[in-house]
Swiss-Prot record:
Enzyme Commission identifier(s): 4.2.1.20
SUPFAM superfamilies: Ribulose-phoshate binding barrel (SSF51366)
UniProt keywords, alphabetically: Amino-acid biosynthesis, Aromatic amino acid biosynthesis, Lyase, Tryptophan biosynthesis
Name of the molecule in the record: Tryptophan synthase alpha chain
Organism whose genome encodes this protein: Azotobacter vinelandii (strain DJ / ATCC BAA-1303)
Enzyme category, top tier: lyase
CDD domains documented for this protein: Tryptophan_synthase_alpha
GO cellular component, one term: cytosol
Amino acid sequence: MSRLQTRFAELKQADRAALVTFVTAGDPDYETSLAILKGLPEAGADVIELGMPFTDPMADGPAIQLANIRALGAGQNLVKTLRMVRAFREGDRTTPLVLMGYFNPIHYYGVERFIAEAREAGVDGLIVVDLPPEHNEDLCDPAQAAGLDFIRLTTPTTDDKRLPRVLAGSSGFVYYVSVAGVTGAHAASLEHVEQAVARLRRHTDLPLCIGFGIRSPEHAGSVARLAEGVVVGSALVDRIAKAGSKEQAVGDVLGLCRELAEGVRRARR
């Protein structure tokens, strides 16, 4: 089994949801970002999404857009992001790590080269938000052939006619964007999320992870009762933006991660 399959199987056995945390690689700089990345599993992150900085992150809200600007300004690029994954894997062979971002930097880097180096570095899966299933041959198919999961996003506007096409070829888990719009937007109602989860379960057996707008342990816990995973990104990235020092950024992000993890763990007790 893949690391993602193993992790979700373990959590199903334990009857709890996964805490999926998102941070942008290189934010606010390489060393601080690496310290955060290395600390996330011990702070309670079950799965990590690591953002690949890009100059035009159109699906992201202000917090993550600024994180991209900070990271790029500090010199982060795809080579350094893969180096960061290798450094993380030196001390952690079990926590699933998914790279999330946009196709342009991957295309520029070279798809074949990117897939080979991502696999070698210890990446488990990819989320590429601007690559629809009509372009599976561009990245999804070769990535899966190399052993990388390809995780699709679904939204409230993905209708039943479109949904099977979106889910075809998906692996690892399904990321449900609970509100239409950019990351960090207002949260969807739990009733809406519950209805969406029921609809998705009619189309897939993959674990469902819910994201966008989740900021507090209480909210994370509420969502954890409905799905296999809870994704938190903007709330963590905000802690980096507001920190007065690099040391505080590490401490604040990991502190919030611990609080969120406790909220998720309490959800089904």
